[in-house]
Amino acid sequence: MKSRLLLLTMLAGSAALYAQSNPLTSALKQNYNGVKNNILKAAEKMPDADYSFKAGEGSRSYGEIVTHIAQVQGALCAGAKGENKQFDVSKTDKASAVAVLKETIDYCDSVYEPVTDASAMEMGKMFGRDQPKFNILNFNVIHDNEMYGQMVAYMRIKGIVPPSSEGRP
């Protein structure tokens, strides 16, 4: 009986240790998944006709915001992966912008998924400078959140409830 209890305790302890073995990158992945889902939903939710909408003179259109997100996250994930991958962000209509956004999300998923706390300390390139992968991927999350904030403002101006506020009174 005591040996079974000891075995169960050891198994439970090792499972808890495994779950916490990559706390930095687990949190990073959680943050990335949250913002990428909001961005994709926001891109899909904005009507096609509003992709040319600009909040003011000198600002990007909604379509340009979506393709900017795709361009930057594609470049950052490529830098973290040690590649020089390019994505076609030249078209800002809804179909093209959402397509390239999905392409860069799929690509970034392949970069975030295998990263561990140890591999996150390996070097990659960000804007031509050597940086730990963690910094590059974390900057992507920061930038995505900043750009999602702009998407939210555009959606609110158009009377559309953004994904992160759906279901709230």
Give the label of every model feature segment:
Residues 45-51, 112-121, 156-163:
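Surface-exposed helix-capping loop/turn segments at secondary-structure junctions
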